[in-house]
C-alpha cells in the first residue's frame, strides 16, 4: 500500500512506523547507484514487505525504544508543513551545534555559507560537516524521487530539542536550540536539502499527544 499526503488526515500509527523503516532502508538504495526504474522497484518491494508485517514485528525493528514509545503514545496525521516551522535534530550528522540551533532554513543557510567558505568550523567538526554537505547534495540530485516517497516524521516542538538536548545543554552552559512548532524525528537531512533546493514545505507525518482527561 502507498499513501499520498494531500491534506490533514489521521493516519494509523503503523503507517508512520512503516515509513520510518522504509526511509532507513532507502539509504541503502542510493549507495547502490540504482537507476530511476530500479529505485522505484526497490522502493515498492520494501514498502510491500513492511505493509505485510504485523505491527509487533515492525516494532522489533526499532533499535531506539524511546522513539518507539513516542510513536506509540502519539496520534498521527498526514499533511504538508512549512520547513520554517521545523527544527532539525541537534548536531545532526555531527554538524556543529551552532548550525542546528535555528529552524530548517537557518540550518540550510549555515550549510550554504560553509560550502562557500564564508564560515569555518573546528577541526573536530570539519570532516563530518563536509560529509553532511555531500549527503545533502546527493539528496538534492534525487529530490524528485525522495520528496514524494519519504515523508518527514515530526514530533511536537520541544520533544527532542528541549527534552533530549536543551535540558542537558543548560546544565553544561552549551548553546540552546530554539523551539518551533515541530521537531524532526526522521528526515532532518532531507528537510535541509529541500530548503537548500529552494523549497519551502514538505509532506510529513506529525504526531500529537492525546489530550488527557
What residue ranges belong to the model's regions?
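Basic- and aromatic-enriched surface patches that contact anionic nucleotides/nucleic acids
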Residues: 4-54, 58, 62, 170, ...
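Short alpha-helix boundary/capping and kink motifs at helix termini
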Residues: 32, 41, 46, 54-183, ...
Amino acid at each position: 500500500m502507498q499513501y499520498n499526503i494531500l491534506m490533514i488526515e489521521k493516519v494509523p500509527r503503523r503507517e508512520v512506523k512503516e515509513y520510518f523503516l522504509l526511509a532507513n532502508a532507502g539509504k541503502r538504495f542510493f549507495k547502490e547507484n540504482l537507476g530511476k526504474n530500479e529505485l522505484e522497484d526497490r522502493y515498492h518491494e520494501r514498502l510491500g514487505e513492511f505493509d505485510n508485517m504485523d505491527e509487533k514485528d515492525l516494532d522489533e525493528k526499532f533499535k531506539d525504544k524511546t522513539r518507539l514509545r513516542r510513536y506509540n503514545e502519539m496520534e498521527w496525521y498526514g499533511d504538508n508543513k512549512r520547513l520554517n516551522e521545523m527544527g532539525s535534530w541537534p548536531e545532526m550528522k555531527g554538524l556543529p551545534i551552532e548550525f542546528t540551533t535555528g529552524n530548517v532554513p537557518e540550518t540550510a543557510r549555515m550549510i550554504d555559507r560553509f560550502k562557500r567558505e564564508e564560515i569555518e568550523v573546528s577541526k573536530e567538526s570539519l570532516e563530518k560537516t563536509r560529509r553532511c554537505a555531500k549527503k545533502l547534495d546527493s539528496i538534492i540530485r534525487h529530490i524528485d524521487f525522495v520528496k514524494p516517497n519519504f515523508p518527514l516524521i515530526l514530533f511536537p516542538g520541544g520533544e527532542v530539542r528541549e527534552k533530549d538536548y536543551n535540558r542537558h545543554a543548560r546544565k553544561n552552559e552549551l548553546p540552546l536550540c530554539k523551539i518551533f512548532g515541530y521537531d524532526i524525528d526522521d528526515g532532518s537531512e532531507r528537510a535541509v536539502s529541500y530548503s537548500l533546493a529552494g523549497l519551502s514545505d514538505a509532506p510529513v507525518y506529525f504526531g500529537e499527544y492525546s489530550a488527557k482527561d
